[in-house]
From Swiss-Prot:
Enzyme class: isomerase
The organism's place on the tree of life at top rank: Bacteria
Catalytically driven reaction(s): N-(5-phospho-beta-D-ribosyl)anthranilate = 1-(2-carboxyphenylamino)-1-deoxy-D-ribulose 5-phosphate
Similarity comment text for this entry: Belongs to the TrpF family.
Protein name: N-(5'-phosphoribosyl)anthranilate isomerase
Entry keywords, A to Z: Amino-acid biosynthesis, Aromatic amino acid biosynthesis, Isomerase, Tryptophan biosynthesis
Amino acid sequence: MPAVRSKICGITRIEDALAAVAAGADAIGLVFYAKSPRAVNVQQARAIIAALPPFVTSVGLFVNASRCELGEILDAVPLDLLQFHGDESAADCEGYHRPYIKALRVKAGDDIAAACLAYPRASGILLDTYVEGVPGGTGEAFDWSLVPQGLSKPIILAGGLTPDNVAAAIARVRPYAVDVSGGVEQGKGIKDPAKIQAFMQAVRRSNESM
């Protein structure tokens, strides 16, 4: 099995992005959703991306953004990948002609396989925890046994991951990648370098044992 990749999401500061890179993260996530405590503006995002070395993917997270708002951000910020975390349809996601991943909030009874097929051009599907009225960043894990094997898209596992549970999550789901935000923070939007290191060490150990 290929090595599981990793994304540190909710980056708001250059130093946190560099801590993620130093720990070995493959990608960093920037939240463009004003209601999130981890939201960044265009100026912050540009500065963070400018500080990244080559081959680290910058991901922009959006929640039901208007075409005008999202288009203005794309004109100003050199994002590598878009992450749609709201109720966007496949047509909505594909309208920007950029690589994208679609987040699904998982609850019992969901047909994850069918949901993957509903976004045929997605680069991957991110699975997060369903909490009513909250689009993401809940800090709560969902029941990993709900994720079937053999899905049609690469799976990015999110939702309540921490340095303590990510190894078990990888062993159970065998995802393409894992995505963490609150599990490596010392406060909302402020990352903890030691927790990032611990998370990445757990991912590496899992990769070495597979």
